[in-house]
């Protein structure tokens, strides 16, 4: 994928040495940008090969048919669609749209379908409960089963919600950002500046046209829906058990996390 590249970017360099204090991409050439995309494609191809190897082991050991296999991702990756690289910095489609593939075990059939309707990763647990006929948990987490979508195409009633902390520079504290998607409408909300952007994602899947100035009442409605969802999330969080202690990681793990940009 990237063996053709002869530029200055060092793949093994740490995140902070490459982006010490900003997300500016002005110094990157078109060749650099193509190389970054190709390196990401290499990562995807490597992950695909590892998944294939795992499935081959399950198959050769006669365990594949009895296995529940779930393929998913925690986030997408940006390549300047909205002026940024990397991930977890904004809440546009390229950051949030990820795959979810479920291979059910032997004895669980009838769920084979491709669901195009947007869903949330919090829907995974209730989907597994329904699909495997497990006792449903009534408290402690959110989400809804996707099984009705398979059988009768029922549309999602609950909005999709996401949050992140935007890092503009490492000299400033992260800025919280929130997103709510209800049907074809999506709002991005910055609590610190109390500012909103809204998009009609059916007509504008690339989220390039902010309609908040043209549709102030729609913006207000979506903002109120987002704030209600935030309040509900916080109330639910109060019911969650206290997290256990985090054990100190060894030096090699800390080095890897720093290289990936998780520590500074």
Predicted regions located by residue number:
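Catalytic domains that recognize anionic headgroups
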Residues: 1-264
């Amino acid at each position: 994928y990237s063996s053709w590249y002869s530029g200055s970017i060092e793949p093994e360099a740490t995140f902070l040495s490459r982006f010490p204090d900003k997300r500016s991409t002005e110094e990157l050439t078109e060749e650099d940008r193509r190389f970054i995309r190709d390196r990401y494609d290499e990562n995807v191809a490597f992950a695909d090969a590892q998944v294939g190897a795992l499935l081959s082991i399950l198959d050769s050991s006669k365990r594949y048919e009895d296995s529940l296999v779930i393929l998913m991702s925690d986030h997408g990756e940006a390549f300047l669609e909205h002026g940024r690289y990397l991930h977890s910095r904004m809440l546009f489609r390229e950051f949030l749209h990820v795959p979810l593939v479920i291979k059910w075990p032997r004895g669980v059939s009838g769920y084979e379908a491709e669901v195009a309707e947007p869903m949330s990763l919090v829907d995974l647990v209730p989907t597994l409960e329904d699909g495997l006929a497990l006792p449903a948990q009534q408290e402690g987490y959110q989400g809804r089963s996707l099984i009705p979508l398979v059988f009768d195409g029922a549309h999602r009633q609950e909005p999709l919600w996401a949050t992140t902390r935007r890092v503009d520079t490492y000299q400033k504290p992260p800025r919280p950002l929130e997103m709510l998607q209800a049907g074809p409408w999506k709002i991005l909300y910055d609590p610190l500046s109390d500012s909103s952007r809204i998009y009609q994602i059916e007509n504008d899947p690339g989220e390039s046209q902010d309609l908040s100035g043209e549709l102030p009442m729609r913006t207000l409605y979506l903002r109120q829906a987002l704030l209600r969802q935030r309040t509900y999330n916080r109330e639910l969080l109060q019911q969650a058990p206290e997290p256990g202690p985090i054990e100190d990681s060894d030096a090699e793990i800390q080095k890897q996390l720093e290289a990936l940009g998780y520590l500074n």
